């Protein structure tokens, strides 16, 4: 009894065997109307769970259908000529592969109580490479292109619990955007990669040692690009430990009718992706739809107004807000800092710019489920604890924020603060954010805009940012409005040239991303809004979860509630006033920030940002 005959029996479809057909690596030239697929055969008792498992992990396991003795797979029954590319199936007993069979005659009785699943294998990376004008690379071995087991877990359903399997192609860095456009044109969202960059971020130790197939060699100018692989089904079969199961071996497929309806439905303009570098060490790129990216750019333009006429337009760098937000979107744990003691003759010396933006960002990070903490000056610890407590009491925050201090004296102290047990391979935080935080100048002092040295009021939190530059996996963002804030070292040349007193006050400490705003609080609000846009974007959201598990957009309602609002920010500023925190420019204890009244200026900015964020994409 041949495999093709059993498929015919199980699926009640006409199946004719091509027993001598060669292994086909590139399916782009297959017979029109047919597409390649892989087969999984499981006991009927496991069928509902496996169907749910595939539906919960659509990226690696796009299920075309299933059939049993009393059911016909619609896609297969529509055609009388279903051809078997490889007349082979792997046999599994209790999760162990016991061999490859070309005849299942001895299992004909068991097959009556089994269900066959057909998994779509039609997306061709080679076709996308060809369309993008990227030459194919030769394999280092005779089999199909390599696939790798990752440490990324698929969504667990009943007894199906396994890692995601991915396939990789090396792509020249300057061809990444073109490749993503080609994959979108061919297959829409289903053709998008789930990781671009360092394989270690997927738990892959060596690209030269694939778990399946042959290695495709990378060149120095290449970036590894990874797609979910249907070979994940083999790991699923192993994990369920069924007493008997069968599955297509790697590289072996059957041909089924093409699913033209689903292919056409996914080709939508709003899904056209952009790719952006968000980290050099480790190398990491993220993707987002073009419309979502444009909305974030609109936020960046909105906050770039210069109400104080300081000349901040000279400090602007394109897409810093977008790249900072993309990096934050991938982070699991974020450390936020704020505090600029410009009023050194008053108690407290802090200003009203900074804490509201920091709290607004922290609130949204919490809504996304990210671990969030704050680090402040020891001198101001009690003040910030009261601010957070009052923010929770008045509904500005839902969850307490751990508040830390740092008074280390060396880079070793800073590394110990950032890393578990001082191990650079185990950072406590993925991303550091400074919002209106006093920044160290080139001479080691800290200056306000009037060139007054306030070093005696500032703890060396800058050292944490400097130490992070040498720890792989930690990124940083600085938000400022005058160039003397922590992180603005990235634009210090422009600060020295264009900002009043810039030659003295310019911060010398650089962040990976420098977000420039007319008022720093606006930068914090804009980061929260940008994170909402990104996580509401189907392209980015799928990339974040590696195309496994359910969509995270189910939390969208709680995200809306976590966005800044005029009501919440009015309460937040009121809390600062109650604690005698003063406006930065005027020194007034009142409802203003940087000398600008809340209701006339800041409330309008919040409305603009949130309105642009929540409008339909």
Swiss-Prot record:
It catalyses: D-glutamate = 5-oxo-D-proline + H2O. It comes from Mus musculus (Mouse). Its main location: mitochondrion. The lineage of its organism: Eukaryota, Metazoa, Chordata, Craniata, Vertebrata. Disruption phenotype: Accumulation of D-glutamate in heart. Mice develop normally and do not display any visible phenotype under normal conditions. One of its GO terms (biological process) is glutamate metabolic process. The keyword Hydrolase does not apply. InterPro entries: D-Glu_cyclase, D-Glu_cyclase_mito, GLUCM_C, Putative_hydro-lyase. The keyword DNA damage does not apply. The modification N6-acetyllysine is found at residue 93. Its EC number is 4.2.1.48. GO terms for cellular component: mitochondrial matrix; mitochondrion. D-glutamate cyclase that converts D-glutamate to 5-oxo-D-proline. Keywords: Acetylation, Lyase, Mitochondrion, Transit peptide. It is found in: Mitochondrion matrix. This is D-glutamate cyclase, mitochondrial.
């Amino acid at each position: 009894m041949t495999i093709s005959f059993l498929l015919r029996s199980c699926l009640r479809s006409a199946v004719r065997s091509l027993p001598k057909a060669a292994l086909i690596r590139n399916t782009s030239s297959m017979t029109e109307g047919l597409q390649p697929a892989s087969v999984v055969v499981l006991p009927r008792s496991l069928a509902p769970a496996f169907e749910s498992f595939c539906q919960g992990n659509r990226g690696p396991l796009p299920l075309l259908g299933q059939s049993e003795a009393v059911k016909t797979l619609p896609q297969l029954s529509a055609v009388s000529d279903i051809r078997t590319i490889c007349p082979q199936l792997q046999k599994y007993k209790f999760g162990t592969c016991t061999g490859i069979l070309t005849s299942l005659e001895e299992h004909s009785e068991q097959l009556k109580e089994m269900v066959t699943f057909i998994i779509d294998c039609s997306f061709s990376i080679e076709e996308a490479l060809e369309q993008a004008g990227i030459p194919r690379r030769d394999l280092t071995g005779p089999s199909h292109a390599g696939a790798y087991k990752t440490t990324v877990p698929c969504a667990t359903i009943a007894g199906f619990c396994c890692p995601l399997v991915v396939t990789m192609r090396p792509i020249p860095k300057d061809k990444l955007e073109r490749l993503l456009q080609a994959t979108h044109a061919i297959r829409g969202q289903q053709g998008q990669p789930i990781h671009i960059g360092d394989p270690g971020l997927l738990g892959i130790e060596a690209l030269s040692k694939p778990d399946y197939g042959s290695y495709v060699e990378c060149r120095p100018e290449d970036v590894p690009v990874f797609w979910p692989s249907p070979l994940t089904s083999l790991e699923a079969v192993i994990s369920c430990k069924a007493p008997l199961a069968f599955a297509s071996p790697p590289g072996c497929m059957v041909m089924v009718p093409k699913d033209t309806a689903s292919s056409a439905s996914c080709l939508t303009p709003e899904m056209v992706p952009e790719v952006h570098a968000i980290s050099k060490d480790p190398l990491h790129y993220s993707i987002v739809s073009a419309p979502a990216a444009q909305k974030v750019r609109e936020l960046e333009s909105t906050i770039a107004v210069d109400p104080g006429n300081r000349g901040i337009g000279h400090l602007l760098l394109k897409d810093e807000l977008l790249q900072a937000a993309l990096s934050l979107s991938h982070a699991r744990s974020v450390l936020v800092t704020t505090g600029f003691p410009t009023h050194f003759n008053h108690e407290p010396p802090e200003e009203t710019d900074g804490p509201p933006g920091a709290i607004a960002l922290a609130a949204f990070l919490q809504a996304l489920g990210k671990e969030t903490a704050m680090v402040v000056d020891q001198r101001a610890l009690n003040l910030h604890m009261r601010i957070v407590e009052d923010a929770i009491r008045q509904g500005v925050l839902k969850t307490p924020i751990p508040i830390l201090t740092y008074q280390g004296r060396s880079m070793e102290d800073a590394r110990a603060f950032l890393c578990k047990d001082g191990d650079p391979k185990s950072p406590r935080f993925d991303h550091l954010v400074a919002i209106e935080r006093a920044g160290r100048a080139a001479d080691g002092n800290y200056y306000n805009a009037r060139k007054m040295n306030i070093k005696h009021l500032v703890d060396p939190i800058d050292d944490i940012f400097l130490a992070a530059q040498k720890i792989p996996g930690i990124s940083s963002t600085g938000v400022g409005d005058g160039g003397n804030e922590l992180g603005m070292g990235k634009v210090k040349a422009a600060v020295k040239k264009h900002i009043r007193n810039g030659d003295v006050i310019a911060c010398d400490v650089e962040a990976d991303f420098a977000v420039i705003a007319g008022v720093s609080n606006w930068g914090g609000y804009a980061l929260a809004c940008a994170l909402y846009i990104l996580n509401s974007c189907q392209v980015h959201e799928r990339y974040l979860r590696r195309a496994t598990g359910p969509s995270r957009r189910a939390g969208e309602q709680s995200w809306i509630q976590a966005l800044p609002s005029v009501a919440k920010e009015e309460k937040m500023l009121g809390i600062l006033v109650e604690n005698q925190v003063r406006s930065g420019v005027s020194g007034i204890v009142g409802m203003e920030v940087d000398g600008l009244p809340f209701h006339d200026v800041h409330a309008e900015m919040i409305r603009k940002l949130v309105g642009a964020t929540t409008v339909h994409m």
